Amino acid sequence: MSWQDKIAQGLQRRRDAAAYRTRQVNEGANGRWLQSGERQYLNFSSNDYLGLSQNDEVIAAWQQGARRYGVGSGGSGHVTGYSQPHARLEQQLADWLGYPRALLFISGYAANQAVLTALTDADDRILADKLSHASLLEAAAHSPAQLRRFQHNQPEALQNLLIKPCQGQTLVVTEGVFSMDGDSAPLAALQQQTSAAGGWLLVDDAHGIGVHGEEGRGSCWLQGVQPELLVVTFGKAFGLSGAAVLCQEPVAEYLLQYARHLIYSTAMPPAQACALQAALRQVQQGDALRQQLQQRIRQFRTAAAHLPLQLGASKTAIQPLLVGDNQQSLIWAEQLRAAGLWVTAIRPPTVPPGSARLRITLSAAHQPEDIDRLLEVLYGLCH
């Protein structure tokens, strides 16, 4: 088989399964609206949970940072790319979340890959929730450690793995809020079991940070848990991009020595770190935005419970409506788009086979009438 045949067959498999991914060009998007071509859509596919991507103070901080520091960092943080804005942001994050250290990464994907591959050796094991993000599962699979997955959000399933012998160290991996189902992990139970077995817990709280807890401190704070490793990302509630790993001092120093994604990647622009400091202030002061988001979630769930579709058991901004069939999910997504609503159909392999869905995400930027319009069109599709 030639390279051309290999590529052609791989593409055809996705088409045959109604799982072919495409990108849509848009002219601008935020928590509420998306502009594509000549049309404006109500945006129910964004992770901009607090609407901060268009916040005036955040934008001004980026602009001021760019004028002061330029538009790029100029190198790895180990060479010339680590500036005062980076150091200040790391300290502010550590103080806010109650850890000695924070390390910045260019993305949550990079952070997860770096931590799992740098910390583990061949005699270690990684025990991961089956529905953990692709970045976690891929990093675990590529790490030298043995990977075992436990049933989603089932502490007893984790316990069955923890009691098995391991020559090295155990790292348990989960998410605070799961990106496709919107449900939350039982973090207190997972941490208790992990600690009792002498292991460490890593929580990726990409979809919980900024949204849950006092000052938006996230899922771990809400559940009274401090994992050994906390990954927070800035592409959701913060309205920007990038990530940070929160940990103890020796762990941070170890990652600085061994985390290749830190050592060999250009650091985020200092201007971005300036904008993230402004976004952090907005998150900390964002109780009104979080309350507004919760109101939109309750409004949607109360009415969506009467739809003839399976509504996920989510109390978060991620509200999946299970369709099952790949093609049907695409048809409904197109019909919603024709009605001026941007809703994304999520299909395997992103989610398990037979669980194609409309993944609806809500934002504090949405207005009550936006939710009413979405529900009106959904009712029309189902009846």
UniProtKB/Swiss-Prot annotation:
InterPro entries: Aminotrans_II_pyridoxalP_BS (IPR001917), Aminotransferase_I/II_large (IPR004839), AON_synthase_class-II (IPR050087), AONS_Archaea/Proteobacteria (IPR004723), AONS_Proteobacteria (IPR022834), PyrdxlP-dep_Trfase (IPR015424), PyrdxlP-dep_Trfase_major (IPR015421), PyrdxlP-dep_Trfase_small (IPR015422). It holds the Pfam family Aminotran_1_2. It catalyses: 6-carboxyhexanoyl-[ACP] + L-alanine + H(+) = (8S)-8-amino-7-oxononanoate + holo-[ACP] + CO2. The keyword Cell inner membrane does not apply. Its EC number is 2.3.1.47. Substrate binds at R21, H133, T350. Gene3D superfamilies: Aspartate Aminotransferase, domain 1 (3.90.1150.10), Type I PLP-dependent aspartate aminotransferase-like (Major domain) (3.40.640.10). Pathway: Cofactor biosynthesis; biotin biosynthesis. Belongs to the class-II pyridoxal-phosphate-dependent aminotransferase family. BioF subfamily. Catalyzes the decarboxylative condensation of pimeloyl-[acyl-carrier protein] and L-alanine to produce 8-amino-7-oxononanoate (AON), [acyl-carrier protein], and carbon dioxide. This is 8-amino-7-oxononanoate synthase. The lineage of its organism: Bacteria, Pseudomonadati, Pseudomonadota, Gammaproteobacteria, Enterobacterales. The gene is bioF.
